[in-house]
Amino acid sequence: MNKKKKIISSIIGIIVVLLAGYFGIDLTQDSKVPKDSELMISYMDVGQGDAAYIKVNGNDILIDAGPRSNSKELLEQLKAKNIDDFELVIATHPHEDHIGGMVDVFKEYEVKAFYSPKITHTTKTYENLVKAVKDEGLKTKELKGGMVIDLGEGAKFEVFTPQKSEYEELNDYSPIMKLSFGDTSYLFTGDAEKLAEEEALA
């Protein structure tokens, strides 16, 4: 299957994952993965912003954290999930509606690894996040096209974009990532627009 077909098939997974996140469905029933594996995806209610929580094979993962104005609501939702720490936190791009609440996540939880695209022009919100990452004693791991993040037991993130080191629009830094879990996959895109889509399909 070529890359374009893989991306298109992954888009179908978005519908499944949206329903799973809404209804809190455990997505382990029909996937070809070990019986002790698990996957749960929840889209958090952060108002006019984005945040997704993933539990896979014992790993707690957060993709974006919504705006700072809704960080209290985000933390309440995360607390209800009995999270001790995050194995992985991903910031897709520097817009406030995606990463504004992330500083408070770092204050509340231990974070073991932080990924973000390499940003050449930034925002004050992103600078505050970078400081929080350093205060945690972490180094930012660059998120870029071609990399794979192993999540164990047949689960992994494949990153298709960004493929360049500099873009005019901040949205174009948004990674297009496929989460594979057994024979099922789900696509995460941040605020990726036409340019990122073209890069992913190239």
Predicted feature locations:
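Non-globular, low-confidence helical/coil segments that flank catalytic cores
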Residues: N2-A202
